[in-house]
Amino acid sequence: MPSQDEVEEFAALLRHLKGRTDLSYAALARPLHINASTLHRYCAGEAVPLGFTAVERFAALCGADPAERVELHRRWILAVAARRRSRTAPPPAPDAT
């Protein structure tokens, strides 16, 4: 499913950035003013933040360079759009058997 691929690409970049630090989810989440479990869900691809502010601050904490920040923003836009599409998709038609 394309939408899940876009969400996973966003999550993979978050995990890559987190992996460059020696900080726990709790240590990274604290200055972002979000719960550690929320940050973990973002990194696992289980959720996508509706706003970019926390993602931008996360990137800064992880030492992302300008090109990585642009790529993270691009992937976030695609992930948000994919989640919106998956939520508004019509239910599958029932079988006519």
What is the meaning of each model-derived region?
Residues H33-L50:
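Recognition helix of helix-turn-helix/homeodomain-like DNA-binding domains
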Residues M1-K18, R30, P49-T97:
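Short amphipathic recognition helices of helix-turn-helix/homeodomain-type DNA-binding modules
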Residues T21:
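Flexible coil/turn residues that form the inter-helical turn or adjacent wing/linker of helix-turn-helix
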Residues A26-A27, A44:
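Short, charged low-complexity linear motifs
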Residues A27, T38, A54:
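Ca2+-coordinating acidic residues in Ca2+-binding motifs
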